[in-house]
Amino acid sequence: MRKLVYLAAFAALLVALQAGRGGSATVTTADSATQRQADLYQIDQIEVKFHRATSRHDIDLMMSIWAPGAVFNIDQQTLTGKAQIRHWFLTENKAFMPTHHWESDTPSYKIKIALNGDKATMYFECHYIDPKTGMVVAAAGVTHTLQKINGQWLITNSAGSTATLSP
């Protein structure tokens, strides 16, 4: 009986607190800031997955960050849809070549993210390092347009570019 009284009192307290906030429809500045930080973290994970996928030759991980109808402009080609993008990574991307065992890295200070609601842009560089020599063997830049689709941030459009190896 005592547990039931405590439970009822706790429920009443929650209702009172929620009513004092104006209900769940009210979004506070703290809520907005927290959501923004969560979105920025999730967007940053796209770069992490991108580089993990190239280092490990994990095509499924790579494709998990692309939207179904994504467009990728790379090497004077326009690839449309996950099938064409997947094919390019498997057949033309040097980091995915079976004979290359490169580590893929990005200088964190070169990552640029602009967030606007459920859309964002992100730029990062890919520095491919031969672990045997410690030398950068290839570098590229990429600008992604991202969208939050069904609660998940995905690449909808991307364009490859040359990277600047200086700060």
Each model region followed by its residue ranges:
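A mature extracytoplasmic/lumenal domain signature
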Residues: W66, Q76-T78, G117, F124-Y128, ...
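Bacterial N-terminal signal peptides
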Residues: A8-A16
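Short, low-complexity N-terminal intrinsically disordered segments enriched in polar/charged residues
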Residues: R21-I65
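Positively charged n-region of N-terminal signal peptides that target proteins for export
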Residues: M1-L4
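Sec/Tat-exported extracytoplasmic proteins
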Residues: E47-F50, T54, D58, W66-A70, ...
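Short beta-strand edge/turn micro-motifs at domain boundaries
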Residues: G23-D31, A139-P167
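Surface-exposed, charged secondary-structure patches
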Residues: V71, H87-M135
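Hydrophobic pocket/interface hotspot
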Residues: F50, M62, A70, G81, ...
